[in-house]
Amino acid sequence: GLDVVKDYKQIRQQVGYMPGRFSLYQDLTVEENLDFFATVFHTTIRENYDLVKDIYQQIEPFRKRRAGALSGGMKQKLALSCALIHKPEILFLDEPTTGVDPVSRKEFWEMLRHLKDQGITILVSTPIMDEARQCDRIAFINEGEIQGIDVPERILQRFSHILCPPGLERTEVHAGNDFAIEVDQLTKCFG
């Protein structure tokens, strides 16, 4: 293992991080943000283009636009490109789809599957259970403590009393890869 104090430079090269509030420089253009993050990691966009190509091609038409003028979905793609620019082995994503429209959210999860297929380990924090279901394993955290780690279906079964408390009716709707829970009488529990 690595020591987080002594080996921080090596760890920084191996880890990509995308915070929930995208850490982009709003006054810089798309291209300038990517160049900046590449420089921080002693690389270039060209050197690691193969990893970000599929994502970058979607934002390339906006490369001269300031990040602050992008839509939520475009900011998300730019932030992901910046987190990947140095080819990390592990990618940490903190609530990556918060505030993003449903179409961009779906596209984002498709991008994550593609990155996983390329061998990148991805850790995602999300309060959205249909997103958690797309993961191979879930660490279910309740009131600040890990309650269990398992595959999504077993976590949902084991903690259904927390995820859907007694007296709260729900209907699960499955349509292909999409998943939704319709909850009745929500104000009864949360007033």
Predicted segments, located by residue:
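Conserved ABC ATPase signature
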Residues: R66-L70
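Hydrophobic anchor residue at the start of the ABC signature
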Residues: L80
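ABC ATPase "signature
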Residues: I149-D150
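Conserved catalytic motifs of ABC-family nucleotide-binding domains
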Residues: K87
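Catalytic Walker B motif of ABC-type/P-loop ATPase nucleotide-binding domains
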Residues: L91-D94
